[in-house]
């Protein structure tokens, strides 16, 4: 019946910058692009589908309308996406070389290491290296 999580959606007002970050820094590839001329808000929206290892992130940009930013950090509801990395030190060194700030961690626990970065919209992205 239920097979897998198909995609996660991120609303942005910086579509090109966000696509560049996810593809140029994090290694996602553009799977598809779409434009819907009249969304539920009555304005056109641009969609970019990004793929990483079979998981898709759908970027959504509403044309010409102000959208309230998501609440920061601790709140009820979804909080962040997490990317698994092979080597936390190499991943964080690479991200820093690209000008990406590691805003939390790395913190090493018995079975994993984790750190956090932010995308250009300020959304948290967790990095996780499993040791088992």
Where are these regions (language model features)?
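Core segments of cupin and vicinal oxygen chelate
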Residues: 9-55, 97
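Vicinal oxygen chelate
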Residues: 1, 92-132
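N-terminal beta-strand motif that seeds the catalytic metal site of vicinal oxygen chelate
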Residues: 1-19, 78-83, 131-132
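Residue-level detector of beta-strand structural context in well-folded domains
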Residues: 47-48, 81, 115
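Acetyl-CoA-dependent GNAT
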Residues: 61-66, 129-132
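Short, charged/polar surface micro-motifs in flexible loops or helix N-caps
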Residues: 53-57, 64-66, 88
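Exposed loop/turn and edge beta-strand positions of beta-sandwich/beta-sheet ligand-binding modules
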Residues: 4, 43-46, 77, 111
């Amino acid at each position: 019946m239920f097979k897998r999580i198909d995609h996660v959606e991120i609303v942005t007002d910086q579509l090109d910058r966000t696509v560049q970050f996810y593809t140029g820094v994090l290694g996602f590839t553009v799977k598809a692009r779409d434009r819907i001329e009249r969304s539920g808000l009555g304005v056109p929206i641009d969609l970019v589908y990004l793929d990483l290892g079979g998981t898709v992130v759908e970027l959504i940009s509403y044309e010409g309308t102000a959208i309230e930013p998501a609440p920061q950090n601790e709140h009820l509801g979804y909080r962040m996406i997490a990317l698994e990395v092979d080597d936390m030190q190499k991943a964080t060194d690479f991200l820093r070389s690209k000008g990406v700030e590691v805003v939390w961690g790395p913190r090493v626990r018995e079975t994993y290491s984790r750190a956090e970065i932010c995308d250009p919209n300020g959304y948290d992205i967790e990095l996780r290296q499993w040791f088992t």
